[in-house]
C-alpha cells in the first residue's frame, strides 16, 4: 500500500 508500512500482525505505522 502506498505510503503505508505494516509491522507485526496488528501494529500499523502510517508513513506519509
Swiss-Prot record:
Keywords: Adaptive immunity, Cell membrane, Immunity, Membrane, Receptor, T cell receptor. This is T cell receptor beta joining 2-2. Alpha-beta TR is a heterodimer composed of an alpha and beta chain; disulfide-linked. The alpha-beta TR is associated with the transmembrane signaling CD3 coreceptor proteins to form the TR-CD3 (TcR or TCR). The assembly of alpha-beta TR heterodimers with CD3 occurs in the endoplasmic reticulum where a single alpha-beta TR heterodimer associates with one CD3D-CD3E heterodimer, one CD3G-CD3E heterodimer and one CD247 homodimer forming a stable octameric structure. CD3D-CD3E and CD3G-CD3E heterodimers preferentially associate with TR alpha and TR beta chains, respectively. Signal peptide: none annotated. One of its GO terms (cellular component) is T cell receptor complex. GO terms for biological process: adaptive immune response. The keyword rRNA processing does not apply. It is found in: Cell membrane. J region of the variable domain of T cell receptor (TR) beta chain that participates in the antigen recognition. Alpha-beta T cell receptors are antigen specific receptors which are essential to the immune response and are present on the cell surface of T lymphocytes. Recognize peptide-major histocompatibility (MH) (pMH) complexes that are displayed by antigen presenting cells (APC), a prerequisite for efficient T cell adaptive immunity against pathogens.
Amino acid at each position: 500500500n502506498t505510503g503505508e508500512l505494516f509491522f507485526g500482525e496488528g501494529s500499523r505505522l502510517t508513513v506519509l
